[in-house]
Amino acid sequence: MSLSLDLDLQIAVDSNQLPSQADFETWVRTALGNTLDTAELTIRLVEIAESQSLNHDYRGKDKPTNVLSFPFEAPPGMELPLLGDLVICVAVVEQEALEQNKPLQAHWAHMVIHGCLHLLGYDHIIDQEAEEMESLETQLIEGLGFSNPYKEA
């Protein structure tokens, strides 16, 4: 069964190195796999200031971060295909890829997959959950032809 995906890509930043809409759709489909028949989500690409503000307001951390996930919680009794929103800071993703000596496209794929897994309920606060999430991320990333994102470059 093929996933019916409605992806709203919002670009609130100037950059000439952004992946294409098709890239984002591929990465979202990879992350969601066969878990859903229909999915709606928004990916918003932002500047440092917006990322920092959201990270401060929602996580109490006064610094920008690579990806923030905002899962949608439907009211009881309502079945909606809306997964939620991902907010990705372009400058942080680009800087991390450079610092970690990773291809930019591979790091973008990792951040989108990582964020989507959060929308599906995965987390990495507890060590066991972190291992499960990282293992799944690695499997999905390698399935796209990229290297293990957690292996030191």
UniProtKB/Swiss-Prot annotation:
Binding site for Zn(2+): H114, H118, H124
Enzyme class, broadest EC rank: hydrolase
Keywords of the record: Cytoplasm, Endonuclease, Hydrolase, Metal-binding, Nuclease, Ribosome biogenesis, rRNA processing, Zinc
Cofactor note: Binds 1 zinc ion.
A single BP term in Gene Ontology: rRNA processing
Predominant localisation class: cytoplasm
Keyword match Phosphoprotein: no
Annotated EC: 3.1.-.-
Keyword Magnesium among UniProt keywords: no
Superkingdom in the source lineage: Bacteria
GO cellular component: cytoplasm
Alphabetical list of Pfam families matching this protein: YbeY
Obligatory cofactor(s): Zn(2+)
Subcellular compartments: Cytoplasm
GO molecular function: metalloendopeptidase activity; RNA endonuclease activity; zinc ion binding
UniProt xrefs under InterPro entries: MetalPrtase_cat_dom_sf_prd, YbeY, YbeY_CS
Record-annotated membrane-spanning stretches: none
Function: Single strand-specific metallo-endoribonuclease involved in late-stage 70S ribosome quality control and in maturation of the 3' terminus of the 16S rRNA.
UniProt protein name: Endoribonuclease YbeY
